[in-house]
Amino acid sequence: PTTSVQDESEFVFHHDWGFTNENCLVLNVWTPGINDGKKRPVLFWIHGGGFAAGSSQELPSYEGENLAKKGDVVVVSINHRLNVLGFLDLSAYGDKYKNSANNSVLDMVAALEWVKTNISNFGGDAGNVTI
């Protein structure tokens, strides 16, 4: 951990790789307020990585706390299946797997559906979501 104000190299270069796992369907929500009666716009953020690598929490700069406070928005970041877990086409094995090549995209759709249903509990406006 950082031990002084001058020692920021760990903060800048630290990657939180966490534990890789196909059970990665999580999202993070930052909100500046819940019980103040406001309906805030929602920023729905999908990390980069070319659908092959990355996560919503791998860098400290990915945390949405400051953006939520300064922008008065609700920030949602998501994880989704990547690489083979997200895009392997298993449709040759039957109808059960006909959409398997789109798992990553379906994860994103499921996260957006969750936002539509639940974001009002975090002070967000489900009708005002920016991706």
Q: Where are the model-predicted features located?
A:
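Serine-hydrolase-like catalytic core of hydrolytic proteins
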Residues: 15-131
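Aromatic- and Gly/Pro-rich amphipathic surface segment
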Residues: 1-23
